[in-house]
């Protein structure tokens, strides 16, 4: 009998494989994405010091009251995290898509972050 594939387990394996190759530094931190069924979260992380430099999510007060599709809200999260990162002096980042396909909400967030000043 064929066992059912757990998509999240496959994603976590893919993410672990990618994380072995990616690391954020103080000069070029990592933009990490987490996507749930309802929300999306983005963090700019300096892996050397283990600190989060900037973050944004759809659960924040200013974004939680917004209406629109999940893709539109993801773009607003990308815009917000890019502005917060640039306030901290971050211009270039390493994009960590968290094992998710570069499509839909993840792509919208990345494009919005690029349009608002982050380079990757």
From Swiss-Prot:
Subunit organization: Part of the 50S ribosomal subunit; part of the 5S rRNA/L5/L18/L25 subcomplex. Contacts the 5S and 23S rRNAs.
Keywords associated with the record: Ribonucleoprotein, Ribosomal protein, RNA-binding, rRNA-binding
InterPro entries per UniProt: Ribosomal_uL18_bac-type, Ribosomal_uL18_bac/euk
Gene field: rplR
Function: This is one of the proteins that bind and probably mediate the attachment of the 5S RNA into the large ribosomal subunit, where it forms part of the central protuberance.
GO MF: 5S rRNA binding; structural constituent of ribosome
PANTHER family in the cross-refs: 39S RIBOSOMAL PROTEIN L18, MITOCHONDRIAL, LARGE RIBOSOMAL SUBUNIT PROTEIN UL18M
Listed name of the protein: Large ribosomal subunit protein uL18
Secreted recorded as keyword: no
Family indicated by similarity: Belongs to the universal ribosomal protein uL18 family.
């Amino acid at each position: 009998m064929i066992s059912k594939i757990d998509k999240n387990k496959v994603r976590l394996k893919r993410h672990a494989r990618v994380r072995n190759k990616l690391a954020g530094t103080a000069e070029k931190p990592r933009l990490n994405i987490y996507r749930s069924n309802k929300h999306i979260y983005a963090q700019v992380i300096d892996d050397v010091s283990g600190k989060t430099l900037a973050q944004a999510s759809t659960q924040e007060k200013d974004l939680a009251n917004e209406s629109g599709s999940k893709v539109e809200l993801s773009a607003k999260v990308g815009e917000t995290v890019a502005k917060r990162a640039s306030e901290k002096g971050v211009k270039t980042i390493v994009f960590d898509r968290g094992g998710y396909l570069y499509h839909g909400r993840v792509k919208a967030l990345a494009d919005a972050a690029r349009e608002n000043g982050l380079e990757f």
